[in-house]
């Protein structure tokens, strides 16, 4: 069992009327509450923006894994030092090898933690018309290319739109 969490994106938080000031601080504080609750069932934490004093029922056994949807260097370092790894969307193999792995692995090693999990998700499609499907994926999911964190990953990978990262081909 693994719990995946993420920071969201400024534009999405604005739509909900929620501020996006200092997202890395928010992530650190959130994990300062979440991780002890999952580990021991109790927490006493007072941060700059988040506070929690609670005790919850926790069943016996190991805590569930926790991964952070992290793309930028700061978030990857937090994930590497505080969680079990990261979960990625719209990140290609070049960027994983040259940016994601070195950043999160170095943070984990510096913190004396085991090598973190890296979970990558990409659409996989079988079709008789790969070009048309890639075009449709890019049109349907164009918003990802407009979000700063994904746009940065596209640039690192050398692609311009989501369809360029999809694994698309024919059955033959």
What do these predicted regions represent?
Residues 1-172:
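Active-site-adjacent structural elements that line small-molecule/cofactor binding pockets in enzymes
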């Amino acid at each position: 069992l693994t719990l995946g969490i993420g920071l969201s994106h400024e534009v999405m938080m604005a739509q909900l009327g929620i501020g996006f000031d200092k997202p890395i601080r928010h992530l650190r504080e959130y994990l300062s509450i979440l991780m002890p609750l999952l580990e021991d069932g109790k927490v006493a934490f007072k941060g700059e923006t988040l506070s929690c004093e609670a005790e919850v029922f926790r069943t016996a056994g190991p805590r569930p894994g926790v991964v952070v949807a992290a793309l930028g260097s700061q978030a990857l370092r937090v994930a590497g030092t505080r969680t079990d790894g990261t979960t990625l969307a719209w990140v290609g193999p070049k960027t994983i090898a040259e940016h994601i792995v070195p950043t999160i692995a170095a943070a984990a090693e510096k913190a004396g933690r085991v090598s973190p999990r890296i979970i990558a998700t990409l659409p996989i499609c079988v079709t008789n018309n790969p070009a048309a499907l890639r075009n449709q994926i890019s049109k349907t999911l164009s918003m990802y290319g407009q979000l700063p964190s994904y746009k940065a990953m596209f640039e690192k990978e050398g692609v311009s739109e989501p369809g360029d990262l999809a694994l698309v081909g024919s059955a033959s």
